[in-house]
């Protein structure tokens, strides 16, 4: 048996002396134990300082002030059409996020299996999809599985254009609140040492692998020893590769503060302008059009910094200038130059 979390109490029958039982502890398991907490605010206070809590609330307030945000849990009821749409969107979010990180997605090979089986599990309340919507657009999607009083986080991603708003952090807090309301005591974030898991989790242990085999079979014992050593080598190599990736990523951001996705696509320069050009010199555009998707993060960041709601935002292309645009809000406007 593989990847058994320590909170599972597996009752093994008394083994005959003919059998041997070996436990090998492998990768770290990050989880949130909600036992003893009445609400998400209590957990937040126990896990974060006042400054971090204030920052999170500020991001939530800013997100909800700038966009028409809805939080939806699909648990026990979802149409197949909506399910297929959300899985398609989730895959796009994951691909873009991992391309930005320069990393590969560990569940990529299991994607079709997960998609084919999770729909029925949602209807049976053995799984759920949590979605944060901006209007009708999913900007954060999380698939979780449920059994007994445990919620197991499986797949999650968010729209990196909204990264300034801490959408991923808001996702975790909303799910903690939902877990408590639905009597789930453990929110398991699985393996992978990422900053958000370290920040949110109050318990870390090691997943276990269990081996049971006959004592009088030296080949089985040899096989188990070989498997354990292969796991050790594999985990060591993965850890070394992860730290190399982490160091490289931090170095790139230190030498060039622009994000990797920006560096691949374009360099964006912003200029504050005091007044708008004449109407004949500009053309209104819609950033929801795929042709202008490269402007979305710039527009959303402008909204964040200026507390501007989407309803007050207009975006224009400057007719007589190459790759030049204007983002206009109710209070101010900026010129955007794409190099």
Annotate each predicted stretch with a short phrase.
Residues 1-3, 189:
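Conserved beta-strand positions
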Residues 4-16, 20-163, 267-339:
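A conserved beta-strand-loop-helix scaffold within acyl/acetyltransferase catalytic domains
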Residues 44-45, 103, 160-162, 178-179, ...:
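A short, structure-level motif marking secondary-structure boundaries and short turns
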Residues 47-52, 66-67, 74-80, 136, ...:
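A general structural signal for short secondary-structure boundary/capping elements
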Residues 112-222:
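Aromatic (often tryptophan-rich) hydrophobic motifs at membrane interfaces
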Residues 213-265:
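Charged, amphipathic alpha-helical linkers/stalks
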């Amino acid at each position: 048996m593989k990847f058994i979390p320590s909170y599972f109490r597996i009752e093994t029958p008394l083994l005959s002396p003919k059998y041997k039982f070996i436990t090998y502890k492998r990768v770290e398991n990050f989880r949130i134990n909600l036992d003893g907490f009445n609400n998400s605010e209590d957990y937040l206070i126990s896990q974060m300082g006042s400054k971090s809590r204030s920052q999170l609330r500020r991001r939530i307030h800013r997100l909800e002030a700038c966009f028409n945000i809805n939080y939806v849990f699909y648990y026990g009821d979802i149409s197949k059409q909506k399910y297929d749409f959300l899985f398609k969107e989730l895959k796009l979010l994951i691909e873009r996020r991992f391309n930005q990180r320069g990393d590969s997605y560990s569940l990529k090979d299991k994607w079709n299996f997960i998609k084919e089986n999770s729909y029925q599990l949602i209807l049976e309340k053995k799984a759920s999809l949590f979605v944060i919507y901006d209007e009708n657009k999913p900007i954060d999607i999380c698939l979780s599985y449920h059994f007994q009083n445990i919620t197991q986080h499986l797949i999650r991603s968010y729209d990196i254009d909204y990264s300034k708003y801490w959408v991923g952090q808001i996702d975790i807090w909303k799910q903690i609140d939902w877990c408590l309301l639905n009597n789930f005591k453990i929110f398991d974030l699985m393996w992978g040492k990422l900053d958000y898991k370290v920040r949110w989790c109050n318990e870390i242990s090691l997943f276990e692998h269990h081996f049971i085999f006959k004592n009088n079979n030296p080949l089985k014992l040899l096989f188990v020893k070989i498997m354990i050593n292969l796991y050790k080598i594999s985990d060591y190599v993965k850890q070394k590769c992860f730290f190399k990736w982490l160091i490289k990523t931090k170095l790139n951001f230190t030498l060039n503060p622009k994000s990797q996705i920006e560096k691949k696509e374009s360099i964006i320069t912003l200029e504050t302008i005091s007044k708008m050009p004449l109407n004949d010199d500009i053309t209104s555009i819609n950033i929801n059009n795929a042709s202008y998707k490269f402007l979305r993060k710039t527009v959303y960041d402008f909204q964040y910094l200026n507390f501007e709601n989407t309803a007050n935002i207009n975006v224009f292309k400057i007719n007589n200038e190459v790759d030049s645009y204007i983002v206009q809000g109710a209070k101010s406007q900026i010129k955007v130059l794409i190099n």
